Amino acid sequence: IYGNDHVVCGYIPSAAPKGELAESGPAEICDVTNGEMIAEVVLKHKVDTVYNLAALLSVVAEGRPQLAWKIGIDGLWNVLEVAREHECAVFTPSSIGSFGPETPPNHVPQDTIQRPRTIYGVSKVTTELLSDYYYRKYGVDTRAVRFPGLISYVTLPGGGTTDYACDIYYSAVRGEKFVCPIAKGNYMDMMYMPDALRAAVELMEADPTRLVHRNAFNIAAMSFDPEGVLAAIRKYKPEFEMEYKVEPLKQANADSWPNSLDDTCARQEWDWKPEYNLDRMTVDMLQKLSAKLGK
């Protein structure tokens, strides 16, 4: 069903795919704020499912709130309208950033108070509600997950509150001391990218008759604080060092987000199950980054 020839990468010129991604399959310039452009790509390639990943990350969004809304919400509206007209399914991810300080901090249930205090979070809650609206009113097959912090060796992090959990592995492989922007003891849910990609595919493949929820499912894999990931790395690099230099904006975001999510509904409704825990991810990250960086 899938494969390089069956996935079309939409991009804007300032963020054109490079390297392996550029060579992996068809790609089209496609600005999410331009509904006609989206429709042209959908028609040209006979697209039946749209993975709408266009968004500013949490820290960047706080500095450019109007642009964050334009991309995240006006863009989503365009995607949903095209999907309604051309009978496409739509996956638009939400995030742990959709929660706020009034949310229960531990094992957050699927349905609970959200009330985020960042434009990133406000836009994610709006994304969930607007996606559900299009499903109920127009029958558009919308589905989503609330992603934890995502960790990957492929793409460098940039502009997110949870980026430290990726940056720390780069420092470890390079033999550098890591300067952590998040305070000791601040737990957040995290997930390795292979699990995140699998979740995005498996949810869209799931039997719709089993889905009580749609936008958006809690999914979880691991929850740790900076000391936890430090200890995991030191099992394989005992000389690795870390110090703290807390960045106020990132810390404020982290303080308003929950420590962990309860993903029972995802497990029950579409058989979600993560494959990577902290140790398994650490082994793979260190191996893959060592090869990538030539260390």
Predicted feature descriptions by range:
Residues Y2-P17:
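Conserved glycine-rich Rossmann-like NAD(P)H-binding loop of the short-chain dehydrogenase/reductase
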Residues L21-N34:
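Rossmann-fold cofactor-recognition segment
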Residues V32-I71:
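NAD(P)H-binding glycine-rich loop region in Rossmannoid oxidoreductase-like domains
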Residues N52, W77-I119:
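Conserved Rossmann-fold NAD(P)-dependent oxidoreductase catalytic core, especially the SDR/UDP-sugar
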Residues D132-Y187, M193-R198:
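NAD(P)-dependent short-chain dehydrogenase/reductase
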Residues P181-A183, D189-K295:
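C-terminal substrate-binding subdomain of Rossmann-fold SDR/epimerase-dehydratase oxidoreductases
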